Regions:
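Short beta-strand-centered segments that line the small-molecule binding cleft or hinge
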Residues: 124
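N-terminal secretory/targeting leader peptides
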Residues: 14-121, 130, 137-268, 272
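Serine residues within intrinsically disordered or low-complexity segments
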Residues: 275-277
């Protein structure tokens, strides 16, 4: 799934400096690129999504507006990125929706286990204008603007223990994100959910701090988690939604021209072929 309508704009941010804001408005050209932060690796749908957005912004502005993409948690983990984005220090963030539940509880619509039967059903909701309008209001209330969604298919479990029945989940220490809905799901199965920053997962599996983890296939492969795990259990318990958001504080500094340029952006399907269904 990758049908986006991006109707927000750009303005100078804290990392670019107030001086560059004035220069950009006066000369119509940015002195520094605006940062877009992500915690995902380069070889993922998340990165391609972010780069496509940055490319379209530059193309439609004839090179006057530039965005630099920073993957691999270079600018911070998911929580740090959200906090910095809300403050306007990092204007753009592309990330999974799960960490956002702490900041905007209604984003949990994608964190209810076993709610969707197929990834196509998820995409139907995301592509529904009425649904998107409701979600955009949720982000507005939280201090952000929602520009669009993408997905990486469903999340699955990897483990070193063969799972043949529900009883086999009992006692397994599984890494989860810091999300109460995710943790409640694994507790209900008898597992022991262990919230952990993703950058620590590989070492955690290697050292035995955790027994298992759950992520979409692309994340498992790109981070070589298969080197530490023997089995994949296709639980398909949650869709892995990727959101592109912008700071509301950052948006206040937009010029009319910048808003007009971004209103023209429509990313039709830059990563559909890489999205696993």
């Amino acid at each position: 799934m990758m049908i986006l309508s991006l109707t927000a704009g750009l303005a100078a941010c804290g990392l670019a400096g107030e001086g560059s804001q004035a220069a950009a408005k006066d000369a119509g050209v940015q002195r520094y690129a605006w940062p877009l932060g992500s915690s995902s690796p380069e070889d993922t749908v998340t990165q391609i999504y972010a780069e496509k957005f940055a490319d379209e912004v530059e193309r439609l502005s004839d090179g006057k507006m530039k965005i630099s993409v920073y993957p691999n948690s270079v600018l911070g983990g998911d929580r740090e990125l959200l906090e910095s984005c809300k403050d306007g220090d990092i204007p753009f963030v592309v990330q999974n929706t799960a960490p956002q539940v702490t900041f905007m509880k209604d984003t949990a619509v994608f964190d209810m286990p076993a709610l969707f039967d197929s990834i196509d059903e998820v995409r139907e909701h995301v592509d529904n204008p009425k649904f998107m309008k409701l979600m955009q209001q949720v982000y507005n209330d939280g201090g952000y603007e929602l520009l669009g969604y993408a997905d990486q298919g469903f999340r699955v479990m990897t483990t070193n223990k063969k799972i043949e029945s529900l009883a086999d989940f009992k006692g397994q220490k599984i890494r989860t994100m810091e999300n109460s809905y995710h943790m409640a799901y694994w507790k209900a199965l008898g597992a022991s959910p262990t919230p952990m920053t993703f950058s620590e997962v590989y070492i955690g599996l290697q050292q035995g701090t955790i027994d298992a983890q759950e992520n979409p296939y692309e994340v498992i492969v790109s981070n070589k988690l298969y080197e530490q795990q023997d089995y994949v259990v296709e639980t398909n318990h949650l869709p892995h939604l990727i959101s592109l958001i912008v700071s509301e504080e950052f948006m206040k500094g937009l010029t009319d021209e910048q808003q007009q340029i971004l209103s023209l952006i429509h990313i039709s399907e830059p990563t559909r072929l890489l999205s696993i269904s």
